[in-house]
C-alpha cells in the first residue's frame, strides 16, 4: 500500500511540475511574441493616431516625414523622432496577463484612442486603456491580443490628439535684427502713418532727424521677434480679412545685412488680437497665418499708431 501511495505522490508531483512548466512556457511564449512584434524605430514608416474627434496620419519617405492629408504641410521634422521612439517603445512593452472577460476593468473594452504603427510592411495597432497605479498605461495590441504596460512617457504621444495638426507645424525662424545689421525700417499703420527709418553711417534717421536714441527700444524689439504658433496654413479666401490682415494695424518692411553679407528684407504684417494675448501675423509673402505674442509688438504697434514723436 505504501508503494502505491509513493507512486501516486510521484505522479502528482510530476503533474504539478508539468503544469508549472506549461504555465512558464505560456508566459515565455507571450514574452517572445512581444519581443518578436517589437518594431525598431529606424524601420517605422507610418504612424496613425486617432480618437473620437480626429485622425492624424504621418508617413515617411526616405528620411522625411509627411502629414498624409497634405504632404505640402510644413511638418516639424525635429518633432518626429520623439514620436517614433514612443511608438517603438509601445511595440516593445512587456505583456501582462489580462483575461478577455476582464478587459473592461482596464478600460480596454471600448476604447477609441488608438495608435497604428507600421514598419517593414507590418502594422501593430494599440488601444489605450486606463492608467495603472505605477503610472504606466494598459495598452492592447489588436493584432496579437496582448495587453501591455506602457510607460507614461511613451503614452504622452496621444496628447497630440488634444490639439491639432497645426501644433506640429515647423515655424519660421525670423532674422535677428541688431543695431549693427539694420539698414532701414519702414513702418506703416492707420491714419496714413508712415515712418521711414534709414541708417546712415551708423546713425538712424527719419529725414535729416537723428532718431537713434528714440528708436533704440524698437530695434531691440525687432531683434526679438518670433512666431509662437501656426494658426492657419494655406488659408481659405477671406481668412486673412477675418484676422484683420487685409487692413493691418501695422506693417513693417525691414532691410538688413544677412550672415552672408548681402542685403535681405523682412516683411511683417500685424493683424487683430487673437483673444489670448497674441496677434495674427503673416511673414514676408507667405500666406500662412501665424501668431505672435502681443507683448513682443508693443513698440511696432505704437509707432504704427502714433508715428515717431
Question: What annotation goes with each model-predicted range?
Answer:
Residues 2-309:
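Soluble, acidic/polar mature domains that operate outside membranes
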Amino acid at each position: 500500500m505504501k508503494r502505491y501511495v509513493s507512486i501516486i505522490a510521484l505522479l502528482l508531483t510530476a503533474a504539478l511540475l508539468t503544469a508549472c512548466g506549461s504555465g512558464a512556457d505560456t508566459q515565455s511564449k507571450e514574452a517572445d511574441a512581444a519581443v518578436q512584434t517589437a518594431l525598431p524605430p529606424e524601420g517605422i514608416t507610418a504612424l496613425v493616431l486617432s480618437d473620437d474627434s480626429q485622425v492624424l496620419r504621418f508617413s515617411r519617405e526616405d528620411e522625411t516625414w509627411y502629414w498624409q492629408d497634405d504632404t505640402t504641410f510644413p511638418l516639424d521634422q525635429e518633432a518626429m523622432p520623439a514620436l517614433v521612439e514612443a511608438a517603438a517603445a509601445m511595440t516593445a512593452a512587456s505583456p501582462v496577463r489580462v483575461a478577455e472577460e476582464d478587459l473592461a476593468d482596464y478600460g480596454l473594452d471600448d476604447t477609441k484612442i488608438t495608435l497604428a504603427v507600421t514598419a517593414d510592411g507590418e502594422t501593430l495597432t494599440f488601444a489605450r486603456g486606463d492608467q495603472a497605479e505605477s503610472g504606466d498605461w494598459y495598452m492592447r495590441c489588436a493584432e496579437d491580443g496582448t495587453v501591455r504596460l506602457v510607460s507614461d512617457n511613451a503614452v504622452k504621444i496621444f496628447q497630440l490628439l488634444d490639439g491639432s495638426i497645426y501644433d506640429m507645424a515647423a515655424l519660421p525662424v525670423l532674422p535677428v535684427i541688431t543695431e549693427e545689421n539694420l539698414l532701414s525700417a519702414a513702418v506703416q499703420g492707420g491714419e496714413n502713418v508712415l515712418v521711414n527709418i534709414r541708417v546712415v553711417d551708423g546713425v538712424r534717421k527719419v529725414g535729416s532727424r537723428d532718431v537713434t536714441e528714440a528708436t533704440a527700444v524698437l530695434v531691440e524689439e525687432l531683434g526679438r521677434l518670433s512666431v509662437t504658433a501656426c494658426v492657419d496654413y494655406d488659408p481659405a479666401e477671406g481668412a486673412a480679412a477675418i484676422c484683420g490682415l487685409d487692413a493691418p494695424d501695422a506693417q513693417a518692411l525691414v532691410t538688413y545685412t544677412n550672415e552672408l553679407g548681402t542685403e535681405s528684407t523682412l516683411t511683417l504684417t500685424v493683424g487683430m488680437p487673437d483673444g489670448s494675448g497674441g496677434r495674427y501675423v503673416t511673414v514676408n509673402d507667405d500666406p500662412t497665418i501665424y501668431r505672435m505674442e502681443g507683448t513682443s509688438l508693443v513698440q511696432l504697434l505704437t509707432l504704427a499708431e502714433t508715428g515717431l514723436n
